[in-house]
């Protein structure tokens, strides 16, 4: 009987250990990138280059679709030709107001404004895309790209993507000379925008995110293996115990 208990405990601890390792491995991967979009950016008459961004469509599908469709312009309106109207060094660069250009306009593909989808992802690093707003549930088309960790924005702004390529261009914009209302003296514009292909299995973002994002994504193969190990261990102990009892 003692050996059975020890075997049961070993199986249980093995399964729980596998679950822990699976959770840790998944957390190290970061959120799933389902779409890629690009901005070809100019400053004045000079091209700065292309910024490629990955969007977290599994975690925030509605916010991702809004940004993706505005990047392609498939609804008849979008980011192409609009400016980065607000730049604050050691904070962020902000754009997306394609109706007024001064931070008071813009609109979403769902109407004028749409609700905060969720706050599962945090502002844990530079190069993140997050929705600009005027308060709760006031998302439109305006967005910002972080240039530092901005944890004070957690729970207030929806993180939905990250810069994959061209972050040096973001740094150039961040270091632009600005005037009133933090507007760049020399206009910084999105000359062209669109969508790029993503492999069918998707891509994975970088790892500076809380484990709650992993939990929201469902069970991974490694986590399923851990559960199977626990189940198999318990089943084995149960069968062995039944055999021993059948001898008496």
Curated annotation (Swiss-Prot):
Domain PPIase cyclophilin-type residues, every copy: 38-195
Secretion signal, residue range per the UniProt entry: 1-27
Regulation: Inhibited by cyclosporin A (CsA).
Pfam families linked to this entry: Pro_isomerase (PF00160)
GO biological process terms, semicolon-separated: protein folding
Transmembrane intervals: 219-239
GO CC terms in record: endoplasmic reticulum lumen; fungal-type vacuole; membrane
Known EC number: 5.2.1.8
Catalytic activity: [protein]-peptidylproline (omega=180) = [protein]-peptidylproline (omega=0)
Glycosylation sites: 139
GO molecular function term, any single one: peptidyl-prolyl cis-trans isomerase activity
Similarity comment: Belongs to the cyclophilin-type PPIase family. PPIase B subfamily.
Free-text function comment from the UniProt entry: PPIases accelerate the folding of proteins. It catalyzes the cis-trans isomerization of proline imidic peptide bonds in oligopeptides.
Protein name: Peptidyl-prolyl cis-trans isomerase B
Species name: Gibberella zeae (strain ATCC MYA-4620 / CBS 123657 / FGSC 9075 / NRRL 31084 / PH-1)
UniProt gene name: CPR2
